[in-house]
Amino acid sequence: MHAYPQLELWFVVGSQHLYGPKTLRAVAENAQRIVDGLNAEGGLPAKLVLKPTVTESEGILALCREANNAPQCAGLVTWMHTFSPARMWIAGLTALQKPFMQLHTQANIEVPWATMDMDFMNLTQTAHGGREYGFIAARLRKPHEVVVGHWQDPRVQAQLGAWMRVAAAVHDSRSLKVARFGDNMREVAVTEGDKVEAQIRFGYAVNGHSLGDLAAAIEAVTPAQTQDKLAQYEADYELTAAVRAGGAKRGQLLDAARIEIGLQGFLDRGGFKAFTTNFENLHGIPQLPGLAVQRLMQQGYGFGAEGDWKTSALLRAIKVMGNGNGGGASFMEDYTYDFTAGQELVIGAHMLEVCPSIAAEAKPLLDVQPLSIGKKDDPARLIFSAKPGRAIHSTLLDMGNRFRLISHEVDVITPPHDLPQLPVARAVYHPLPDLARGTAAWIHAGGAHHTVFSQGVSIHQLQTFAEMFEIEFVHIGEHTDIGRLKQELRWGDATWR
């Protein structure tokens, strides 16, 4: 089963008429064999669709325009089977508005040493056909991925699949609608940003919506719908005594169920795949949406607290990118430190809104506890710890003259001690290369206090995502050096001046 059954990537093979019809037939046959093989055995997240071999400028331009207008096409996988003079590609690549990559491969693994002749050499020219194609892509300043190796190599298939995931995330972003309930938290800087530029650059359509309309959607939820939702909670989670039937906080859980149903209905009716809330703007809502937000994130919606629409949109993109990949993604905030020498840790959490897709526990704890912030009723929430292992924190910033994506690798651990008095979901981690350097690097780069925490995507995918949108990318990891990082930031300032 494909992770993106509604999408397809077009496999486009370049050649030219110079070699005659026999060679072009062989090119088409090899291309069909490769596409069939990759679809059957490559473990790809989306379907590859073979397009007719392109041999002249007019055909390439027509195909690129067709790709632009095809809603199911997320991008092009291009292969130069023979030499394909790259001036033929100028018009098409200039017009192309979707991601593309070069699969630098051959139909054959080994050279037939005993029988190789010039017919074979003319047919099997990826080695220099791909270089010609690569030059024109570089000359046009067109960002693109290059995957090198035989198409049956598992490494090549994995790289191709990873790139497809990024293309799917970009495709989703181009039509993403973000609903904002309330504005940004008052006086906060980093959650602000240029929504017009974001729509030009990424496609994000970010608009505010009335809390009154959301409250009306919640009020319209029926008792039968609420009871069905409670049955889901009882099947999926460990409920504390306070929220079980007859418990002292059961009423608050009923409110949380109504909020989830009403909120999801509002989002789905409007075609929104991401949203924000703000604890300062809750008029007409009985409690800060906590459980609802957690469950909606697990279903793939993007979310940002305190009006943080950039993090909400980025979370949605990373959810799409990692779909079916075995790792979760969540809204997160670096909250507090443990500075014990040699064991320095960050405790990440938020008031409520951490996605259970990252939970170590099979059945998180569902409880209702007081929340002093927001001045509303005690909210429901899921309580758990994040799975141990490597993770990445990412943040999307508006730097005034460009967007910057920062991704920081961290090692998540099982909390070294119980946290009996902390009634929220959390992640405990070692930043790389260590807390001091990793945190200093993050701060030097302007990294936000809100992040997307992910365990199902790679640094390379996030860098590719930034390249596809032609925005700045900053990587903080095991080999980060503060002096070098500051120099790279200055280079970025010069590049986007």
Swiss-Prot record:
GO term, biological process aspect, one: L-arabinose catabolic process to xylulose 5-phosphate
Cofactor binding, note field: Binds 1 Mn(2+) ion per subunit.
Top EC class of this enzyme: isomerase
Pfam families named among the record's database cross-references: AraA_central, AraA_N, Arabinose_Iso_C
GO cellular component: cytosol
Lineage top rank: taxon: Bacteria
Sorted UniProt keywords: Arabinose catabolism, Carbohydrate metabolism, Isomerase, Manganese, Metal-binding
E.C. number: 5.3.1.4
Cofactor or coenzyme needed: Mn(2+)
Pathway stated in the Swiss-Prot or TrEMBL entry: Carbohydrate degradation; L-arabinose degradation via L-ribulose; D-xylulose 5-phosphate from L-arabinose (bacterial route): step 1/3
Binding of Mn(2+), residues: E306, E333, H350, H450
GO molecular function, one term: L-arabinose isomerase activity
Catalytic function, reaction form: beta-L-arabinopyranose = L-ribulose
Family: Belongs to the arabinose isomerase family.
UniProt cross-references to NCBIfam families, sorted A to Z: PRK02929.1
Function: Catalyzes the conversion of L-arabinose to L-ribulose.
Protein name as it appears in the record: L-arabinose isomerase
